Amino acid sequence: MANKMNLAFSALSENESFARVTVSAFIAQLDPTMEELTEIKTIVSEAVTNAIIHGYENDPNGQVYITAELKDRELELIIRDEGVGISDLDEARQPLYTSKPELERSGMGFTIMENFCQELKVISEPMIGTTVYVKKQLTTTKAMCR
């Protein structure tokens, strides 16, 4: 049986931790390992930070949307903004690329997300926004003994 949640919040940097914790609480029902939980929190953090800093350019009037769906032991995440979009996705997905070097960002967000999931798809259109699709399979071994 699938279980689904939807979340929308203002594009404020202080809401990044809120998004991370909310998704973590949602997947807790599957009793993920600490490693899986850390990876999921990192994926959410990277995608939400990208939406706030790059998509909305720190405009708090923007909204970030997250949908999380659990099917068996698979997590599907959709993190979406309606910001400025990404003009060159191939370039943006290159390790160490950043569109804001003045912020001393490492440009590793997409690379990190790719390494922590089974599937990462990014769709973006200039002046329409960006949607990040993530699929992550959780191990069959649960974190705690029952």
From Swiss-Prot:
<dbReference type="GO" id="GO:0030436">
    <property type="term" value="P:asexual sporulation"/>
</dbReference>
<keyword id="KW-0067">ATP-binding</keyword>
<dbReference type="InterPro" id="IPR036890">
    <property type="entry name" value="HATPase_C_sf"/>
</dbReference>
<dbReference type="GO" id="GO:0106310">
    <property type="term" value="F:protein serine kinase activity"/>
</dbReference>
<dbReference type="GO" id="GO:0042174">
    <property type="term" value="P:negative regulation of sporulation resulting in formation of a cellular spore"/>
</dbReference>
<keyword id="KW-0547">Nucleotide-binding</keyword>
<dbReference type="InterPro" id="IPR050267">
    <property type="entry name" value="Anti-sigma-factor_SerPK"/>
</dbReference>
<dbReference type="GO" id="GO:0005524">
    <property type="term" value="F:ATP binding"/>
</dbReference>
<dbReference type="Pfam" id="PF13581">
    <property type="entry name" value="HATPase_c_2"/>
</dbReference>
<comment type="function">
    <text>Binds to sigma F and blocks its ability to form an RNA polymerase holoenzyme (E-sigma F). Phosphorylates SpoIIAA on a serine residue. This phosphorylation may enable SpoIIAA to act as an anti-anti-sigma factor that counteracts SpoIIAB and thus releases sigma F from inhibition.</text>
</comment>
<protein>
    <recommendedName>
        <fullName>Anti-sigma F factor</fullName>
        <ecNumber>2.7.11.1</ecNumber>
    </recommendedName>
</protein>
<keyword id="KW-0418">Kinase</keyword>
<dbReference type="InterPro" id="IPR010194">
    <property type="entry name" value="Anti-sigma_F"/>
</dbReference>
<keyword id="KW-0808">Transferase</keyword>
<dbReference type="GO" id="GO:0004674">
    <property type="term" value="F:protein serine/threonine kinase activity"/>
</dbReference>
<keyword id="KW-0723">Serine/threonine-protein kinase</keyword>
<comment type="similarity">
    <text>Belongs to the anti-sigma-factor family.</text>
</comment>
<dbReference type="GO" id="GO:0030435">
    <property type="term" value="P:sporulation resulting in formation of a cellular spore"/>
</dbReference>
<keyword id="KW-0749">Sporulation</keyword>
<dbReference type="GO" id="GO:0016989">
    <property type="term" value="F:sigma factor antagonist activity"/>
</dbReference>
